[in-house]
């Protein structure tokens, strides 16, 4: 069933393209399957976390730590060494100013970093959509599947080699819409120094 849904999503995103994506049908399908893989690994845990937050069993701080643990563990299952950090407009890396999230890779160590701008997140679905999108960028970046034509297009405000993760973002928002709710996240002040160790390759 997932395979059928993935193909349907790819057809929809091919017809209603979210940006200057030059990949063919199979390239977009591969990206869609990546989002499905992540959901298959993390979906149950994320749904339980969302339910706990929505029912006020946990607060925003517990939620963000729970999400960090789930995403970093799921990343390991996908062969990714992911660190999820929560920043704000003033502490986001300079080349990510204005972005909701970003994806960085340390090419020497393979470690990856996803900073989230908490000032731009107002709901659970926005947060999860952004995380799924940035992981899609990381996977494509590590595999060398980035669309340089998009990166060179100055009109799209992308600073790196963009894989156009909008379909992954939309996929996650739809998957988690049932238990969506507003959230006010705080930042990880002690994590800010991590960003200087990475270059934004993607």
Predicted segment positions?
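Charge-rich, low-complexity N-terminal segments
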Residues: 178-202
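Post-HExxH zinc-binding segment in Zn-dependent metallohydrolases
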Residues: 143-182
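Active-site scaffold of zinc-dependent metalloenzymes
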Residues: 85-128, 141, 157
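Hydrophobic, membrane-inserting alpha-helical segments
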Residues: 1-2, 125
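Catalytic glutamate of the conserved HExxH
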Residues: 130, 134-142
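Auxiliary, metal-adjacent structural segments of Zn-dependent hydrolase domains
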Residues: 42-108
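Short, compositionally biased, intrinsically disordered N-terminal export/targeting signals
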Residues: 2-12
């Amino acid at each position: 069933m997932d395979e059928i849904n993935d193909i349907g999503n790819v057809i929809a995103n091919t017809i209603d393209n979210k940006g200057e994506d030059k990949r063919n049908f199979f390239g977009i399908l591969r990206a869609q399957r990546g989002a499905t893989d992540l959901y298959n690994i993390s979906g149950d845990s994320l749904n339980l976390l969302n339910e706990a937050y929505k029912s006020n069993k946990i607060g925003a701080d517990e939620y963000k730590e729970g999400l960090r643990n789930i995403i970093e563990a799921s990343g390991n299952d996908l062969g990714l060494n992911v660190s999820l950090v929560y920043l704000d407009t003033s502490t986001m890396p300079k080349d990510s100013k204005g972005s909701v999230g970003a994806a960085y890779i340390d090419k020497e160590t393979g470690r990856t970093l996803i900073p989230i701008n908490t000032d731009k997140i107002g709901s659970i679905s926005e947060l999860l959509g952004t995380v799924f999108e940035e992981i899609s960028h990381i996977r494509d970046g590590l595999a060398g599947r980035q669309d340089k034509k998009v990166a060179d297009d100055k009109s799209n405000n992308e600073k790196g080699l963009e894989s156009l993760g909008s379909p992954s973002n939309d996929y996650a928002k739809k998957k988690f819409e049932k238990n969506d709710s507003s959230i006010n996240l705080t930042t990880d002040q002690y994590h800010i120094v991590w960003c200087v160790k990475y270059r934004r390759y993607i």
